[in-house]
Amino acid sequence: MQGPSQLALFYFANGLPPDDIQDLFQRLRSQSKTESGWTLRAFVVQATNALREEIRQLPHHLRNPLTPLDNALDLAVVPDWRRGPLAGALEGVLLCLIEIGSLIAYYERTPDPFKFSARTACFTGIGTGLLAAAAAAASPTLADLPRLGAAAVRIALRMGVLVAETSQSVEAREPDAPADNWAAVVMDLDEDTVREELNLFNASTNNLGPSRLFISAGGTDNVTISGPPSKLRQVFRVSEKLRSARYAQLPVYGGLCHAPHLYNCHHWTWIMEPINGAAFNQNMVDTAPLFSAGDDVPFEASTPRQLFESVVCDLLMGMIRWNRAVDGVVELLGQTLPSECQVYAFRPCAVVTGMVASGQVKLPHCQFQTHDLLGWTCHDDTDNGPTCREDSSIAIVGMACRFPGGANDLNQFWDLLEQGADVHRRVPADRYDVESHTDTSGKSRNTSLTPFGCFIDQPGLFDAGFFDMSPREAMQTDPMHRLALMTAYEALEQAGFVPNRTESTHLKRIGTFYGQSCDDYREANAGQEVDTYYIPGGCRAFAPGRINYFFKFSGPSFDCDTACSSSLATIQMACTSLQHGDTNMAVAGGLNILTNSDGFAGLSRGHFLSKTGGCKTFDCNADGYCRADGIGSIVLKRLDDAQRDNDHIFGIILAAATNHSARAISITHPHAPSQAELYRDILTRAGVSPLDVDFIEMHGTGTQAGDSTEMESITSVFSPGVPKRSRPLYIGSVKANVGHGEAAAGVMSLIKVLLVLQRQAIPKHVGIKTALNPRFPNLDRLNVRIPHDQVPWPRSPTRKRYALVNNFSAAGGNTSLLIEEPPVRPEPKADPRAAFTVAVSAKSKASLKNNLRSFLAYLESQPSISLAHLSYTTTARRMHHNHRIAVHGSTLSSIMQELEPYLPAVDTHRPVPNTPPSIAFVFSGQGSFYTGIARQLYEHHPGFRLQITRLHNICLSHGFPSFRRAITGDLSNDGSEAEPIITHLTIVCVSIALCRLWETLGVKPCVVAGASLGEFAALYAAGVLSASDAIYLVGRRAQLLQELCTPNTHAMLAVRATVEQIRNVLAGQPYEVACINGSSDITLSCSVADIINLQLAIEQHGYKCTRLDVPFAFHSAQMDPLLGPFEHIARGVTFKAPNIPVMSPSLGDCVFDGKTINASYMCNVTRNPVKFVDALETARGMDLVDAKTVWVEIGPHASYSRFVGSAMPPGTATIASLNRNEDNWSTFARSMAQLHNLGVDLNWHEWHAPFESELRLLTDLPAYQWNMKNYWIQYNGDWMLRKDGKSSAAAASHPHQAIPPALRTSLVHRLVCESVQETRVEVIVESDILHPDFFEAMNGHRMNGCAVATTAIHADIAFTLAKYLYSSIMPNSTDAPAINVKNMQVQHGLVARKDRSRPQLIRIRGIADVTRGLVSLSWHLVDEQGRRVEESFATAVAEFGNHEAWLEEWSPMTHLVVSRIDVLQRLADDGTANRLSRDMVYMLFNNLVDYAEKYRGMQMVVLHGLEAMANVTLAAPEQSGGKWTVAPHYIDSVVHLAGFILNGGNGLDPRRNFYVTPGWKSMRFARPLVPGVRYQSYVKMMPIREQSGFYAGDVYILHEGQIVGLVGGITFRTFPRSLINTFFSPPDTMTHGGSQAGSVHQPACSERTLPVGPARQDSAARETLCQGHGLSRTVMDSSDSSPATTLTPPTLPSVAASTESPIVHRAMALIAAETAIELTELSDETAFSSIGVDSLLSLVLAEKFTAEFHLDFRSSLFLDCPTIGDLKAWLIDYC
């Protein structure tokens, strides 16, 4: 305790204490987490925020090592921070953190008060320690120190950055070189002697500018010398006195301080720029004095800001004289006469010991006692009490969704809500067969009691290539995981996420949090055939893990299951993670895709689900909820981070919490008091009154218990009656629209609320179908409203809008979020830039085309959009891909005009390579000067202006005149007023500033070249010269030029000719070759007297020449007088080895070493000819540059780009930095667009950062357009109903057994008998073709007015029996086999009788051969007693296969089929082929077949002779009716194009003949036929040579460009039309002895087998893959406009076939098979990572390779050979 007779003296050192720094910081961290450490905690938080703000503004290469910065104390563990360019700055920051933090901790742990006055304390220190001392001295109380301490930390960083940059301009540090000393202390010499030696050294070495050595500190027996490290070493070598004295290098690594010749008021003004605000400008009253290290009087300051300012000025420009500071402190002690002096320091040190000794001598009456402010760190008594953490609000900055009812984006979702849609429907066929899996009575085992749900359309759609997944992996990966990936990307895209752009987007600090409560796809779909990706594709943990892996997030990934509240509970986890600092950004959401009937069965039998349809939330007849798909993703950040990052904020999560209804009557029953407690907790945390919440999105499932309980809890808190609400409380539930998304329900509700806030309207509630639930309280009295129409909810200027999202779980958990509307942002100011770059990119050509198309449509619809915002969004706030287009313009219309030509050319647009091109910098010379160089950049780009200002200060420090007028345009337009020193300094300084600007933007050279004056800037760029030395040499040379050379006595002439040509023309005339810029571009120098004669002679010989407007003839004899003096000057400059190669035009060579470039070389730069083309050719020969190198010209005008273009191969890219007569912004916008299109990884953030506060992120731009295919494993059969393992095919002898559900369909009615043996299973079934379902199927295919069985009916029966028999053979299998119905032969047509009063029966016999895996099928006519009328009228064989193998087999022929479809389309466009509408097609078809509506799937047909294609859309489920395995009307719709060609086309004569099919060779569907989906059919019918009147062809069925079905060898036979009555009449009306059972004989075909395919069989595609080599097949050119004569599968690429070895072919086939990728897509450039060959698939491939080639292959082979080409080369070399 200090009394009146005590004085406290605080000393703040300039160096880190000798302790283990990391240990000290760890102890500070521990203290900050204690209950008593709240002040230290506040300091750390404020210091962290200050540092983050400063680090954000650093260039990327300086910023990257310091991010992410979660806590300022983490800087102590930055790797190798002492070796980096900011070593000095970081040391200053760490020193301030330790000294201020330890001071706070000391006073937190002791009873001594932190309160000082001018009479009780004084402060002093040295170096950066003075900043910490200033913060302490200016703090009236300990509570004020965190704010002022954070300011000191910020100042330390800014000053360190300034000192480092200024010092680097004086002498550049070599990359990766150890830190060098900028100061040395000399003992035993007085200050005058040392100064005399330094002056002598500086003068003798021409070192009189910024790099001169100087005295920075003086003491009684020592002097400190500061200066560039190389000069310091040199002076101790050449000065005898200094060399003889005792001296030591000081650990000063950050650069030069205490240097008045380097710094001025502009520097400290910049340092103090952010130190503003009331706290820094309050008057200080009776504060303790602060003594500098150079004076005996304290700093004079009345505010904290002034005190900091004085300290900064002293550190930059004041000299250290510590003895004077000690005298001042002792004098103060003498004035106050304390009896005790308590001296505080950070560890004992010699300085404190000396100061105490001096005080004891002069004040013997005063007792001195020292205290160690770090002493507390030695005690292990840290209070480990609870930490008080301040909650942070969480901003939602991005969102995306896939919701039922076609709501595949936010706009569609809002439209659905606005329209009040209820999108529930019957379970679609792509999930499971709703008929067989639903029994509303509940009697059938494992069936659902409800057929209803809400479903996402085509959830299998996915862009596998975008996410580097093979089709095989994509197929096996749960669609929840896949849609999570796509929605995560869309949400991140909307959030403007770019990896590592800011502190909060650093990949190390991003986590994913998703809720998921079921694994339907893994259990019901992928589980049918367990494969390589069954685990990573289906297990829940892989959903968020896959997102982390793809985006390279290193933060946590969590998959959470809390049943119905999973997504909202997981979002709360994400908020907690953000608030605790575990992450800086989070991607969160919920996932639910329903494919497993078990969930429906269990929930409906548990009385959760409605049997009558959708969720009737709030309705009196609410009877349960309706299950729903749902995928939602959101992006979260801390609010301050989001605002700092310039994000668009959709809403703010003020508070989130979860509790449990532990007191409920059962685990599934909600509990109102528990829910109410949760709401109150959240409101208390947020500090919001419940009466201020205007909208609540309730859980609202539509259950009686749930709705009434939730309404009770809501009204009890938010509308209790007393006090009465002044504004209505609106409530609603999205489940009435889109169902209950279960694990995704919470994120569904949250996204709805965010849209409500954005659209400023509450959509109507559609859950009340009859009347309000009577169990609810009187809502009108409570002022609670359920919106029956849309209600406006606009922003208010006086109050904020709040909404609550409520979610509870069937397992008892309750989760709620309180949402606040986003903050209002002021209107942005106009952007000063005159032109902008806009970019569009994608990972595939298809996506690029669609992205471009949607982007242009957006621009067309938004003519008033800000071009600045558009540029910012599409460049700085987008992840860019290899397929890219960037354009520039000054208006929106010009941008559209630039983009539109790319749209038709996308297919030929080449992607940029994965490896960026090399960059070469070319610095142009003095011939390009004009006034106003870089004027717009200087006026409006802060970073560029700062660089020019600092370079200008260097010029002034060298004694050179100001060159600013040349930039601001105050000189005459042609620059004639400017002296050479002005023009030369301007060019070199602008070039250096441009070089730094390009490097800040990520454009860094691998080689540099400079022409004439440009070589000085080039040497700076290569690290040979510092900026100061480059400026010094240029300025001194210009001065010598003015002093020793007479202007306008010599001239220069640019000539378009070779040196040899001019030598012949000017033989004997006086001239010199000054520049050889190209083979036919040279410059001559001569006297003015001779220039006219030279020009005339040259022009007379037909060569073009131009006289240059320059006052001196450089690189000529005119330069000779200045060479000697200039070399003498240059010897005083430090030359270093280049960091990158230098193309030297003065040598015509390339320089790598540190000896070539010296003072003599600089004279050569002035005198020798510029041999630019020689230097360039040498660089090409050394492979320093090549045709792909991008040349960036740096200088006032792009004068050398033409020379580069002429010397390099055609197409070489040249980029301008500035252009005469063009706005700087236009030049840069164009150049950055060019660089981006060339694949250069630009740092767009840095380009927009100076203007970002006035830029806005456009969140309504079209989302990425995916290149999707439907990856879907269809659940087949009904094995989910029979999981007990018992076969339903028990042996039986009864003629009519109860038919199993799996066998009963609309076409199979009764089980006659079933026999099961060891290797054989037989089943006989019976069907009545007059049964309503069967007859309806036949009656939809009417011929000659009769109901005739289409062969598709027989196909469906075949599929049904084959699938049933497979389950009998494999009773324990969960696999759904692929079935090929082969060799279908129909001998007799089947026509229904007119008399339907009695049955008309057929029986079908199926015999399964277990050993061969085949099922033989035969159809028989029987009478009513079951007796056969005759032998079989149809036969077929069913063979079991593999869906994926079929797709792989068909893949090689896909492009051929598609190309033929395209040809037909083009023929139709030009009128050569016929394009027929749906009505026209079936009108023509009607001359033979009258199809019912559900059979009429062909929507359009293009017909050309016997070749045709059709667009097909299958009938909707409500039209279909019945129960089918593969519905006959679906089969017929995709296949009967073949029959239409013959019976409705113009290739044959359908008036005389008709054509019917007796069968086909094979019928396979690799994907289920799905209603509503668009398919394409293609077939070319060909006559069979061997059999007159027969035609055959292959019908290809395609979906989204992929062959998904193939009916191979479908055959038709010709019959005279006169026989149609004979063949197609009802059997009971026939008079010529027709069969009583209803068969109709086909003439001459019952006694023999018909050919069922053309000469080529569809197995040829499989042969292509299996043979692997030696094939010789014909591939049609898709550009051929004539119909093909044959359709054959594609071969392997012709080049490969001719040059590759058989082993390569086999390897490629294996890879194609395992990845499910077409062989044609496996180019040499294909990276294995891009086609999904990960560690798992590598193991599989290695195993397959080993088995195939009988060699030992390791999975690491695909790491060693990352591309297909690499693998091919390896196989050729080693196999």
Curated annotation (Swiss-Prot):
Region of interest (N-terminal hotdog fold), residue spans: 1309-1455
Top-level taxon of the source organism: Eukaryota
One matching Pfam family: ketoacyl-synt
Inducing or repressing factors: Expression is positively regulated by the transcription factors brlA and laeA.
Keywords tagged on the record: Multifunctional enzyme, Phosphopantetheine, Phosphoprotein, Transferase
Modified residues (O-(pantetheine 4'-phosphoryl)serine): 1735
Domain Ketosynthase family 3 (KS3): 391-821
Enzymatic reactions: holo-[ACP] + 8 malonyl-CoA + 8 H(+) = atrochrysone carboxyl-[ACP] + 8 CO2 + 8 CoA + 2 H2O
Positions of the PKS/mFAS DH domain: 1309-1621
Residue ranges constituting the Carrier domain according to the UniProt record: 1698-1775
Positions annotated as active site in the UniProt record: 564 (for beta-ketoacyl synthase activity), 699 (for beta-ketoacyl synthase activity), 740 (for beta-ketoacyl synthase activity), 1341 (proton acceptor), 1532 (proton donor)
UniProt cross-references to InterPro entries, sorted A to Z: Ac_transferase_dom_sf, ACP-like_sf, Acyl_transferase_dom, Acyl_Trfase/lysoPLipase, Ketoacyl_synth_C, Ketoacyl_synth_N, Malonyl_transacylase_ACP-bd, PKS_Beta-ketoAc_synthase_dom
Region of interest (Disordered), ranges: 1672-1694
Gene Ontology MF terms: fatty acid synthase activity
Uses: Endocrocin and related anthraquinones compounds have interesting activities for medicinal uses, including anti-inflammatory activity.
Domains: entry comment: Multidomain protein; including a starter unit:ACP transacylase (SAT) that selects the starter unit; a ketosynthase (KS) that catalyzes repeated decarboxylative condensation to elongate the polyketide backbone; a malonyl-CoA:ACP transacylase (MAT) that selects and transfers the extender unit malonyl-CoA; a product template (PT) domain that controls the immediate cyclization regioselectivity of the reactive polyketide backbone; and an acyl-carrier protein (ACP) that serves as the tether of the growing and completed polyketide via its phosphopantetheinyl arm.
Record's protein name: Atrochrysone carboxylic acid synthase
Source organism per UniProt: Aspergillus fumigatus (strain ATCC MYA-4609 / CBS 101355 / FGSC A1100 / Af293) (Neosartorya fumigata)
Phylogenetic classification of the source organism: Eukaryota, Fungi, Dikarya, Ascomycota, Pezizomycotina
